[in-house]
């Protein structure tokens, strides 16, 4: 059909520019939208998803990279830790210039360079009894990328209370 790219000029040039920018945005993920398991409907779900990553270290960094390149609409990064020299060989979102900086700030800066469309919220603290339930209840998925059992059990409990699926590594 030759009319697939036809667009009404109702709204003028501004509407056309907005239409074109959205069209270009979706082309970014064209390699995954051609997969029958994803398609355009699946990509729209990904673009509308909110994912929390608890821990921005050795598991959280690659998880964040994968999610942002897939086109997740909103990421919430939670970690109270600071980047140290010993982190750099296994946490690819942090560089030598980030030593002493909060991991969530460093990760956000790196992820925004990969995809500036995804909204990224940071929580410069560890997930705990006071903040955890409010953070997780507003997510579609929570990823446990922590390195201790107490945090994992807390995330698991909040996940069950809010019916938000938890993924852990």
Predicted regions, residues:
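Adenine nucleotide-associated cytosolic modules
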Residues: 2-5, 13-169
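Glycine-rich beta-alpha loop elements in corrinoid/cobalamin-binding modules
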Residues: 9
């Amino acid at each position: 059909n030759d009319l697939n790219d036809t667009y009404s000029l109702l709204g003028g040039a501004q509407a056309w520019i907005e239409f074109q920018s959205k069209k270009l945005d979706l082309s970014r993920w064209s390699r995954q939208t051609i997969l029958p398991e994803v398609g355009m409907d699946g990509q729209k779900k990904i673009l509308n998803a909110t994912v929390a990553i608890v821990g921005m270290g050795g598991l959280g960094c690659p998880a964040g990279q994968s999610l942002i390149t897939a086109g997740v609409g909103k990421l919430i990064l939670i970690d109270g830790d600071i980047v140290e020299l010993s982190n750099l060989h296994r946490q690819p979102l942090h560089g030598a210039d980030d030593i002493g900086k909060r991991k969530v700030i460093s990760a956000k800066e790196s992820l925004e360079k990969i995809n500036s469309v995804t909204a990224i919220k940071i929580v410069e603290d560890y997930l705990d009894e006071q903040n955890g339930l409010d953070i997780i209840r507003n997510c579609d998925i929570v990823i446990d990328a922590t390195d201790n059992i107490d945090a994992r059990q807390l995330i698991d409990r909040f996940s069950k209370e809010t019916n938000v699926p938890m993924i852990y590594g």
